[in-house]
Amino acid sequence: MSIFYYDATLSAYESHFLWEQALGYLEKRYAERKENKILNTLVGFSWLYFIEGPIISKKFENDQNGSTLNTWRKYIDLGAAESPEDPFFCFIAGYTLSLHGFHISESYEKKGHSLMEACLRFTNDPWLQQLAENILLNEHAKQYHPLQNGQQICGQFFDGRSLLDRYFNEVFLGSS
C-alpha cells in the first residue's frame, strides 16, 4: 500500500517536468474524490516540486514551480483541518514541514514536529511508527540512520513509481 496516489497522467506530467500541470491535475482529482491518498500526494508533490523541481528538471532559469509553495501550504492547512488524525497525512506533512517549513513561516516548521508526533499517536502500523520515530530521532541530523527492515518498510509505503516514492527510497535506503 503506497502512501501516495499515482497514475499514468501524473507519470506523464512528471516525465516532462510539468510541475504546475501535475499539481493542477492532483487538485482536480482531490476535488472529485476527497481521498486522503490524493491529499498526501498534494502535500508531498507540492513540497518536492518546490524544493527539488528546478534541480530535477534542470530548468533553473525557467522555473515552473512558482505556485507550488502556495499549494503546499494550502493542502497542509486543509489536511490539518480535515484529516488531523490520519497518520499518513501527519507523516508526510510533518516530514516536509520539519525540513522546509521555514519557507512558509517559522510556526510551520515547528508544526512539522507536532505532526510527526501525531503520526506516532494515531498509527497502529509498526512500520509507519518506525519511520516517524527515525525522523524525530534524527530531526536535526544531516541524514537519517538506516531503518531496520528498511527494504520491507519502503516497499510497503513507497513503491518507487513516482519521483516522490523514489525520493523516500533514497532517503531511507540510500539508493534510488
Q: Which residue ranges define each predicted feature?
A:
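Amphipathic alpha-helical repeat scaffolds of TPR domains
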Residues: 1-8, 31-58, 84-102, 125-139, ...
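Amphipathic alpha-helical repeat scaffolds
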Residues: 7-14, 23, 27, 44, ...
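Helix-turn-helix repeat elements of alpha-solenoid scaffolds
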Residues: 11-25, 61-74, 105-109
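Short amphipathic alpha-helical segments that mediate assembly, nucleic-acid/protein binding
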Residues: 19-22, 147-150, 160-165
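Solenoid-like repeat scaffolds
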Residues: 27-35, 79-85, 117-123, 151-157
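Long amphipathic alpha-helical segments with strong coiled-coil/leucine-zipper propensity
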Residues: 48-77, 82-84
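A generic hydrophobic-segment detector
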Residues: 109-155
